[in-house]
Every structure is written in C-alpha cells, then in structure tokens.
Amino acid sequence: MQLTQLLALALSLATSEAAYKGFNYGDKKPDGSSKYQADFASEFETAQNLVGAPGFTSARLYTMIQAGTANDPISAIPAAIAQNTSLLLGLWASGNNMNNELTALKAAISQYGEDLSKLVVGISVGSEDLYRNSVLGQKVNAGVGVDPHVLASYIEEVRSTISGTPLSGAPLGHVDTWNDWVNGSNAAVIDAVDWVGFDGYPYFQNTMANSIDDAKALFNEAVAKTKSAAGNKEVWITETGWPVSGKTENLAVASIPNAKRFWDEVGCPLFDNTNTWWYTLQDAFGASVPNPSFGIVGSTLTTQPLFDLSCSKSNTTSSSAIASPTSTAAAAGGVAGGSTGSASGSSTGTGSSSGSGSNSNTGAASGAVGAADRETSGTSGSANTNGTSGSGSGSNSTSGHGSNVTVPTRPTSVSNVSPSKSSSALFTGAATSMGASPSSVGNVGPSKSSGAASPSSTTMFTGAATSVSAPVVHVVLLALMMVIAA
C-alpha cells in the first residue's frame, strides 16, 4: 500500500473519531442586556482555556440574529472566527420569525463566506419547537411552537437557502426534547433532518426517581430511545447538564458536588466520542443568578471552574448509551477548524440499548419533556424576545434574542437566546439557552439542529473537529510502521 493511501486511511479514520464539544450560548447576558462581539469572544476564549478541560472549542447558538436588531447577523460569528471556535448555528423557528432568521443567515454567508464555512459544524433549524407545540408544552404555557410538517418545510427552506453557498454542505438538524423525538407524530422532522439534536435533563424529570444516583441511567435511557426513533440519523447531544445551585426537583438536588458527578458520569463518556454542547458555561452574572443555575464557572467569567472538570480514563468509558464517534459532520467536511481537543479517553460506549420508546409519548408520563421551561432570556433590544427551548422538565428557562419575537419559557417559560434555567416544571427535557435572564417568555429564540445535509455540490464545507480519541493515534502509528516495514 502506498504512503499516500495509508495516510488517507489514517486521516479518514481520524475524522470519523473526531467529536465536537462546547457549550450553549445565548444572545443575552444573565442581566438581560445584549451580547456583542467582545462578550462572545471572552466566553469562547474562557471555554477554550478551562482548567482541567481543554478542547471545549465549539459553540451552539440559538439564533442567527444579533440581539437588538431585526435581522443583522449575530456578532458571535466574527468572535468565533477570531477565536477559532466551531459553530453549531441556530435559527429560531417559532413565532413567525423565520424570514428574519433567513435574512440574517444570508447576510452572514455573504459577509463571512469561507471564514464562516470552515467553522460550521451544522445548522439547527429550531429549538424545542415540537415540545412547545405538544399537549404538554401547551399545558404549561411553554410558548409558541411549530407544527412538525411546518418545521420540516422550514428545514427544506434552509437547505435551499444554503445551496450553492459556502455552507452548502452543512448538515441540517433540529433540537428538541427526547420525549418529542419518540413521538411518532413528529416523524416528518426526523425524515427532513440530517441529524437529531437531543436535549435531556434528568434533574427536571421530577415525576420519576431522579436523584443524582438515578441521573446516569435516566440519561442513557433517554438517549437510547432517541436513537431508536432517529433510525439511521446521528444523535447529537445538544443540551444537558446539572445545576450547581437552585431548588430541588423531586429527588434531584442542585449542588456543586452533584454537578461534578453528572459531569463525570454523563459528560466525560460523551466528550471525545459524541458531538456534545453542555449547558452551560455561565448563566449567572453578579447578582443575576437564575434558579436553578447551571453555569460551571459561577457568576464571574473565569477559567477556574466551580469543580474539577478533568475526566479520568475510567469515567470516559462508563456510559453504555453513548453513540459511536460521529460521522455526519465529518462527512460534510471534517477536521478543518481547530482540532484542539485532548485525546483523553478512547471510550467506546456504543450505546445500543433498546428503549424503543414507541412513538406515542408526548412526554408527560415519563417526565422527560419540558426543558423549555427552564431558561429565559430577557427581551432584547427590539420589540420582541426570542425564546429558546429547553427540554428538561424544569420550567424556568427563557431567553430572548431580541428580534421581533416573543419567547416562551420551559414548562413554564421558554426563551431563546441565552441559557438561563429557572425551573418550575415537571418534566425532564433539555434546557435551551438563549437569552440571559430566566424570566422572559418568548417564542422565537434560535435553536440548533444540524443534520448531514445532502452535500450540495458547489462549495466545500469544512467543519472544525475539536477532539480526537486515542484510537486515531494508534491508526496513524500503525500506518507509519507499515510504511517503514515496506
């Protein structure tokens, strides 16, 4: 075998082993004020340099719109380009705001072109819209959602919009709570996407035994059911986390020790194997502290986290429901951006698990829905606020990005821009983060779902891998040894 062939093989395997890891970022600060480029840059730089956790070089956004404007591109984009942070872009699909989101998307492509395309992992069309559209979401006044067939049409509209542009190969997806993915009435969305975004928070599954002792099993079961419903579509972990402070949800106690344990038992097995965006880096600022608060750095933006983020080899291989290394983003173009991740645990975690979770649950029974209620984002400069969705059971989140939309809050209020979670709901879904304060309710926040969009032939889409697992190194070394032996 020729050297070039061996290296190509090694590179392809390395690409398939790469996984993106990062945090969710809303368009507003915890106090409700708008974020600008310098704010995003500070957050991205902090995430990349967290003590004990190198490689968090990806950012999930909920909207394409800069807070305080009608449809200007969000300033997180130039910040990401400057910081070499990969992006899971999001368009807020609820509240009749898609036209403005598409305008902002087109403007971003025109303005940033290849610099943007090299960093885009995927594009999420909507965030927890199905949850807010569900019987359960309506019961808790989670905010305006979107019918699955309308959402599927939005996904195709985005696919058409990026065709022939530098983002033409970006995989498209949708982010929602796991119980809505297993609801058969939402199958049209699964058919339309390239990947499925999973939001899940055992903390909010307050109709079940949901202590920290139960968290890992609840999470793995939810992932397994989502994977079963998704069929051959990849499942990306777009929101999960455990609060460092706040009220108790049934048996779930918010505390730093419990947040650390959830990170170890759920996060570490994911980080080098599955595209994962944690909730969250920071959701508190000074006196503005949401209840519950999920931020791992507390109320001051610092590289020193509230608990040890290092992952031991043992806890990087402990989760049985973790998906195998992602290939959707790699297929779309791979390892372009900054592969900075550490190769800490190879971990397999195939996560087969059955959990077919037939298609009928709307989520009330299992308490897995409602992430949308925990986050809130204040209003953003313009007339409306966008809300992000959240999937956990908690109901207190809303965030708004400030265009002309209103944002609902989780089981209670869902906002879209920044991930602050206030909980008052009884489900377990995934929280979304868009706005800053956990109190505003709106229905427009941007969400992220990305899929492996059919590679449209005009441009090359390159993603930015953030971590490469140990097997890749072995493959490369083996290839070199074979060359030497030959």
UniProtKB/Swiss-Prot annotation:
Keywords: Carbohydrate metabolism, Cell membrane, Cell wall, Cell wall biogenesis/degradation, Glycoprotein, GPI-anchor, Hydrolase, Lipoprotein, Membrane, Polysaccharide degradation, Secreted, Signal. The GPI-anchor is attached to the protein in the endoplasmic reticulum and serves to target the protein to the cell surface. There, the glucosamine-inositol phospholipid moiety is cleaved off and the GPI-modified mannoprotein is covalently attached via its lipidless GPI glycan remnant to the 1,6-beta-glucan of the outer cell wall layer. Residues 341-404, 413-424, 445-458 have a biased composition (Low complexity). Residues 1-18 form the signal peptide. GO terms for biological process: cell wall organization; polysaccharide catabolic process. A lipid is attached at residue 463 (GPI-anchor amidated glycine). It comes from the Eukaryota. InterPro entries: Beta-glucan_modifiers, Glyco_hydro_17, Glycoside_hydrolase_SF. GO terms for molecular function: glucan endo-1,3-beta-D-glucosidase activity. Glycans are attached at residues 84, 183, 315, 386, 396, 404. One of its GO terms (cellular component) is side of membrane. It is a lipid-anchor; GPI-anchor. Residues 464-486 form a propeptide. The keyword Ribonucleoprotein does not apply. Residues 430-442 have a biased composition (Polar residues). Belongs to the glycosyl hydrolase 17 family. This is Probable glucan endo-1,3-beta-glucosidase eglC. It comes from Aspergillus terreus (strain NIH 2624 / FGSC A1156). The lineage of its organism: Eukaryota, Fungi, Dikarya, Ascomycota, Pezizomycotina. The gene is eglC.
